[in-house]
UniProtKB/Swiss-Prot annotation:
Gene Ontology BP annotations: maintenance of mitochondrion location; sarcomere organization
Basic and acidic residues bias (residue ranges): 544-557
Compositionally biased region (Low complexity): 270-279, 448-475
Superkingdom: Eukaryota
SoHo domain residues: 499-567
Coiled coil regions in record: 610-642
InterPro entries with a match to the protein in the record: Endophilin_SH3RF, SH3-like_dom_sf, SH3_domain, SoHo_dom
Gene: sorb-1
GO cellular component: adherens junction; dense body; focal adhesion; plasma membrane
Protein name per its UniProtKB record: Sorbin and SH3 domain-containing protein 1 homolog
UniProt tissue specificity: Expressed in body wall muscles, muscle arm attachment sites at the nerve ring, all non-striated muscles, and distal tip cells of the gonad. Highly expressed in the origins and insertions of the vulval and anal depressor muscles and the spicule-associated and diagonal muscles of the male tail. Expressed in small puncta throughout the uterus, stomatointestinal muscle and proximal gonadal sheath tissues. Not expressed in the pharynx.
Polar residues: bias regions: 11-25, 260-269, 392-409, 559-589
Record text on subunit structure and interactions: May interact with deb-1.
Organism from which the protein derives: Caenorhabditis elegans
Amino acid sequence: MMHHPHPFGSNLANSSEPQQPSGQYLNPAADAYNFDTFEDSDKFSPKGNVAALRNVIHGQLDMKTPTGNSSRYQKPAPPPVDSTPSWAKNVKVYEPNGYVDPHLNKHNMGRVLDGPVNPNKYFQGVPPASYSQVKHNESKPPVPPSTKPPHSAAQALQAQVLQSSKAPSQPQQSQKTSYRIPYDVALDPRHHLGEFDIDDSASIISSCISTFGESSEIAGFSAAAEQRHLYEQYRKKLMEEKNELKEGSETPCVSLSEKVMTSSTENLKNGNNQQNQQPEPQPPSSSIFNSELTPFGHVAPVAKQFEPTNFPPFSPEKESEIKRSIDLESSQLLVKSKSPAPYSTSSTDHYGTIRRKHKPVAIDLSKSSPNLASQSPSNLFFGASFEEKQNRSPMTSTPSYKEQGFKNDSLNDSLNQAFEIASSIETTKNAYEAPPTPKSASHDRSISDTYPVSSSTTSTWPSHTTTPTTTTAAAPIAAVAPQTYTEQQPMSTSMSSSVMSTNMDEPIVVGSHQQIPQQSPDSSPERNEDMSQWYRKMFKQMHRKGEDGSNEGKEQHFINPSNVTDGIGRTTPTASNLGRSRENLSFNQHRPDHPSSYFDSLEHGPNDQYNNQERVKQSNEEELLRLKAEKLAEELRKEKERKHSFIPSSAPSLQNNMDRLNSLLYDFSSDIQEPAHRDYTPQPVMTATAVYKFEPRSARELPLNRGDIIRIIREVDGYWMEGERNGRSGIFPTSYVQINTGNQGDSQKMRAIYPFTARSDTELSLKRGEIITRRRQIDSNWLEGSNQIGIVGIFPASYVEPIEQVEQHIPTIVPNRPKTPKIEDQVYNQVYKPNETVIMQSNQGYYDKAAVVPNNKVRFDLPSGSDSNLQMSLNPHQNQFPPTHTQTSTQQPSNYGMKKIEYEREKVVEEVPPMHMDQYRKLNDEPKNPKKDTNILMNAASLIPKGSEMYRAVYPYQPQKEDELQLYTNDIIFVVEKCDDGWFIGTSLRTGDFGIFPGNYVKRH
């Protein structure tokens, strides 16, 4: 049911009659006449009836709207408010029910599954910048009424701060506290006097400030001023307490140098106070796991210690004078303004981190022995060994060796050493705890071998007798403790303090009331033998003799054992055991008065360094020579073991050529430049013919194919020669080639009288009438020779005949094979005459076709006679290749000095037009010898275009067009032009055809 407000003015405010429901008005017209039933007519003036009636009608109309939306007669209702922020609509995070302490559940807080993290709830460091910005001119919708507004995180934190200011109900708080405490103060008795609330509140304040910062809304709530006040109060309290600790002597916060130099009277008084109480016996801890660990920043709990029978009783300090640890790190972190809460092991905000638990150092400097002031603090903390003396800064005056371990260092040295030992030594129990059970030597082998320790009694035994007695051993012991003991507790050196983290469950206490245990069962003969070996090894290292074997001029060093103990569960040899070690080391030489060998060795340093440099330089040179010899030997071995992939049966073997590279190693590796070119007397060129195929194995070798002609440069040795082939020089085996006797032109020429077809690669095919150069005679039936294109092979001796004299006429017998290029007699007689030389001219500047040779033969155009410089003779002795140059038809005749080769595929004979024949004229009326012209025309080599390159077909190729050239394997092609698209233009020697062919099908020959 819907209740409307009073629309009839202020006169209806005190009306006691109940309003009738608006549902009784069925139509607006009835409301105008029956409004007196709704309210009494005498309670409002007639002047307001119209306005009241209008409001009633409007209300009824709004109620009857089918959509239920806001009408134009009243203000629209505010839109529903979405409680979920825009950034968290698609976010899934860990949200526990109710308020969650961020310190106890921080391992689950802010675990974002998808999307960002809400900075209002989850402490993820500094919130985004948009969180701290204030949006201006932003109208927020009215909040719907609620019974009780929920508490925000800021209010919850404020309530927590206000609640923490109250005094705790119990004097000691549990380990798991719900607040972030700088360091655990629950076990600190000084916080039981009403100081815990300040520490607790300051912890929360520092945590809030470090987490949110001043710019966040959390830091701006109403309790910010009180937080500042509490924090300042805590800092003031801390500074006052620090000043009190400096003035008093109950904590080691005072200057350590002043405590070290305390007078003996105060030490005696403090020592007498220890006789009041005596701790109850307690069994030693058997393992590091059952020992109670002390968190970093805690006060070491007072443990009851077992008292040996031979020790004088002593009493611990009172509760007010209990020793506290030096926690400089935590105090400095807390003093900083707005710094994060210092680390505490009691809080749970370190999940997922790995941090070594720190153990405080309990140092009692207020109750030192009377002889403590006379003993050097450096010896107390670092020992008097040789290594420790080198680590420290040199003193103003060098004491004698006997008094070195008992002299007082400077005040600065003692202060620095005290702070160093306070920051390096870590332990878990205080000085009143009983010593643990010593461990076996096998468990500490790594430490004992690297940092051996020994009894402080041995600090003086080098100057005494071989077997020290109890009387001599009691003197240095009395300097540390007021009692006389047979054996002193092992002391740790400064080096061994760095490895004490391995056994941190054992006590390390520096004070006048140190307990001296009995000899450990670990002091076995095997242990003594190990220590002797270590001392012997160190002695040899420090007294290394020179190369001459003498030890004169060098002072012997002795590693003075340390007199500071390390409580890592093992004991070292006693004075008697070290005495036996001294006998083994055989100290028979005189010991100097002071250990100055380290400084004396610096005087001889430059000479030794110079000698060392000379030795290193000499050894380096020898090493380089040795490496070079090994490299050469390895190369020789590889060359000796190398096998060729193709070795003919008749070829000599290279496997036994052991010394074929001896001279090569010196010739090719030497840096000596060859002399410049001189005027040598011309000598005939020596050539060789490759008989077998040779594949190179290095860049210095020259590849050879069978039949290659090599120009010999020099003879390397009896097995290798250096030569040149096709512009490439290199070495090759002598047994793979045959030396040509005499020049190439003087070789015997032979003519093939019968055609011969080769049946193997070693044979040479012959064509009838082909000129062959004879090389050698294989046997009575076979000869070896090369044809005019350089192919070498064997052929029957009966198929050729020697050429004794030059023919006097042009032969009429020509090879039957039409593939061999030649010139017909008719064409020759028509164009060329024996007694004259003709040229061809063209009015257009181009050469025209003078004749077409039938049967795909070659037509030659003689050079122009207009240029006398380009006239060529037909005498082969004057010009070896007169008509071999090929040019394109676009060149002008004045610049064209070579003949032109054209080919016709159609077998049609054309007559030369008269106009062209008239252009021929005589150049020379002198008769020429027709015999020489016949030799040139019949020589197939004369058909090779001048300037062309010879290629050999590697793959067969079938032409696809008319202008393409057919190729067979091993065909010889003379290439005259190379196109950019990879196609070559040339002439096939086998067919005489001219055309184009793919360039990747041929190889340079």
